[in-house]
Design a protein with these regions (language model features):
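Compositionally biased intrinsically disordered regions enriched in Thr/Gly
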Residues: 1-150
Length: 150
Protein backbone atom coordinates (compact mmCIF):
# COMPACT_ATOMS: atom_id res chain seq x y z
CA UNK A 1 0.00 0.00 0.00
CA UNK A 2 1.14 3.53 -0.69
CA UNK A 3 0.41 4.56 2.90
CA UNK A 4 2.46 1.77 4.48
CA UNK A 5 5.95 2.55 5.75
CA UNK A 6 8.81 0.08 5.42
CA UNK A 7 12.10 0.76 7.20
CA UNK A 8 15.06 -1.61 6.82
CA UNK A 9 18.63 -1.26 8.05
CA UNK A 10 21.51 -3.44 6.88
CA UNK A 11 24.55 -4.39 8.92
CA UNK A 12 27.41 -6.38 7.41
CA UNK A 13 28.32 -8.61 10.37
CA UNK A 14 31.03 -10.65 8.70
CA UNK A 15 33.10 -10.38 5.54
CA UNK A 16 36.26 -12.02 4.28
CA UNK A 17 37.59 -13.12 0.89
CA UNK A 18 35.19 -16.10 0.77
CA UNK A 19 32.00 -14.98 2.47
CA UNK A 20 29.81 -11.94 3.19
CA UNK A 21 27.01 -11.94 5.77
CA UNK A 22 24.46 -9.14 6.01
CA UNK A 23 21.74 -8.83 8.65
CA UNK A 24 18.65 -6.75 7.90
CA UNK A 25 16.33 -5.44 10.61
CA UNK A 26 13.39 -3.15 10.33
CA UNK A 27 9.68 -2.68 10.58
CA UNK A 28 6.57 -2.42 8.47
CA UNK A 29 3.94 0.05 9.61
CA UNK A 30 0.77 -0.83 7.75
CA UNK A 31 -2.11 1.59 7.55
CA UNK A 32 -4.57 0.83 10.33
CA UNK A 33 -2.21 -1.43 12.26
CA UNK A 34 -1.84 -0.62 15.95
CA UNK A 35 1.84 -1.63 16.04
CA UNK A 36 4.44 -2.15 13.32
CA UNK A 37 5.53 -5.64 12.29
CA UNK A 38 9.17 -6.23 13.18
CA UNK A 39 11.38 -7.67 10.43
CA UNK A 40 14.56 -9.73 10.47
CA UNK A 41 16.32 -11.43 7.62
CA UNK A 42 19.85 -12.31 6.64
CA UNK A 43 21.82 -13.23 3.59
CA UNK A 44 25.17 -14.98 3.48
CA UNK A 45 26.92 -15.18 0.14
CA UNK A 46 29.73 -17.46 -0.91
CA UNK A 47 31.79 -14.91 -2.83
CA UNK A 48 33.73 -17.55 -4.74
CA UNK A 49 30.70 -19.42 -6.06
CA UNK A 50 28.32 -16.42 -5.90
CA UNK A 51 25.71 -18.58 -4.16
CA UNK A 52 23.59 -18.22 -1.06
CA UNK A 53 24.77 -20.02 2.07
CA UNK A 54 22.19 -21.04 4.65
CA UNK A 55 21.48 -23.14 7.70
CA UNK A 56 21.85 -26.40 5.75
CA UNK A 57 25.51 -25.45 5.14
CA UNK A 58 26.51 -25.10 8.82
CA UNK A 59 23.78 -26.77 10.87
CA UNK A 60 20.73 -28.94 10.55
CA UNK A 61 17.07 -28.21 11.04
CA UNK A 62 16.30 -31.19 13.29
CA UNK A 63 19.16 -30.39 15.68
CA UNK A 64 18.12 -26.73 15.83
CA UNK A 65 14.47 -27.62 16.48
CA UNK A 66 15.46 -29.93 19.34
CA UNK A 67 17.72 -27.21 20.75
CA UNK A 68 14.93 -24.61 20.63
CA UNK A 69 12.67 -27.01 22.55
CA UNK A 70 15.37 -27.77 25.15
CA UNK A 71 15.95 -26.09 28.50
CA UNK A 72 19.43 -25.12 27.25
CA UNK A 73 18.13 -22.78 24.55
CA UNK A 74 19.82 -19.39 24.50
CA UNK A 75 18.37 -16.28 22.92
CA UNK A 76 20.32 -13.40 21.46
CA UNK A 77 19.28 -9.90 22.52
CA UNK A 78 15.94 -10.98 24.05
CA UNK A 79 14.63 -8.58 26.69
CA UNK A 80 14.21 -10.24 30.08
CA UNK A 81 10.55 -9.20 30.24
CA UNK A 82 9.81 -11.25 27.09
CA UNK A 83 11.72 -14.41 28.03
CA UNK A 84 8.94 -16.08 30.02
CA UNK A 85 6.27 -15.43 27.38
CA UNK A 86 8.55 -16.62 24.56
CA UNK A 87 9.41 -19.78 26.50
CA UNK A 88 5.70 -20.44 27.08
CA UNK A 89 4.98 -19.94 23.38
CA UNK A 90 7.77 -22.30 22.30
CA UNK A 91 6.26 -24.98 24.54
CA UNK A 92 3.13 -24.86 22.35
CA UNK A 93 5.03 -25.41 19.08
CA UNK A 94 5.87 -29.01 18.23
CA UNK A 95 9.35 -30.04 17.14
CA UNK A 96 8.16 -31.16 13.69
CA UNK A 97 6.77 -27.69 12.98
CA UNK A 98 10.05 -26.08 14.01
CA UNK A 99 12.02 -28.57 11.91
CA UNK A 100 9.90 -27.70 8.88
CA UNK A 101 10.40 -23.96 9.44
CA UNK A 102 14.16 -24.40 9.81
CA UNK A 103 14.41 -26.70 6.75
CA UNK A 104 13.06 -23.80 4.68
CA UNK A 105 15.28 -21.19 6.32
CA UNK A 106 17.25 -18.65 4.34
CA UNK A 107 17.51 -17.65 0.71
CA UNK A 108 17.05 -18.55 -2.06
CA UNK A 109 13.27 -18.36 -2.06
CA UNK A 110 11.43 -21.66 -2.31
CA UNK A 111 10.05 -22.93 -5.60
CA UNK A 112 6.73 -21.28 -4.82
CA UNK A 113 8.44 -17.92 -4.21
CA UNK A 114 7.48 -17.91 -0.53
CA UNK A 115 9.61 -15.77 1.78
CA UNK A 116 11.34 -17.95 4.41
CA UNK A 117 9.91 -17.84 7.95
CA UNK A 118 13.40 -18.18 9.43
CA UNK A 119 16.83 -16.79 8.64
CA UNK A 120 20.24 -17.73 9.95
CA UNK A 121 23.89 -16.86 9.87
CA UNK A 122 27.09 -18.16 11.39
CA UNK A 123 29.60 -15.85 13.04
CA UNK A 124 32.74 -16.87 14.91
CA UNK A 125 31.41 -20.38 15.49
CA UNK A 126 27.97 -19.34 16.76
CA UNK A 127 24.83 -20.00 14.71
CA UNK A 128 22.15 -17.31 14.95
CA UNK A 129 18.69 -18.38 13.84
CA UNK A 130 15.46 -16.40 13.77
CA UNK A 131 12.23 -18.03 14.81
CA UNK A 132 8.79 -16.55 14.16
CA UNK A 133 6.69 -15.76 17.23
CA UNK A 134 3.30 -14.05 17.56
CA UNK A 135 3.16 -10.32 16.93
CA UNK A 136 2.47 -9.66 20.63
CA UNK A 137 5.85 -11.28 21.42
CA UNK A 138 7.78 -9.19 18.90
CA UNK A 139 7.27 -11.13 15.61
CA UNK A 140 10.59 -13.00 15.91
CA UNK A 141 13.28 -14.08 18.36
CA UNK A 142 16.92 -14.90 17.66
CA UNK A 143 18.27 -18.20 18.96
CA UNK A 144 22.04 -18.50 19.44
CA UNK A 145 23.66 -21.92 19.22
CA UNK A 146 27.30 -22.84 19.78
CA UNK A 147 27.77 -26.35 18.32
CA UNK A 148 30.96 -27.15 20.26
CA UNK A 149 29.16 -26.79 23.60
CA UNK A 150 26.17 -28.97 22.74
Amino acid sequence: EETDTLTVKCQVVSVDSRRLTAVYTGSLSAQGAVHPTELFYTNTLDLTLVEDIGLADYGDALTMAAYVKSEDVSFYDLAADRLSAVTEYIATVDEDTLTSIFESADFPLGEDGAWPESFSYERQGTIYLSMPVPHALGDYVIVSFVPETK
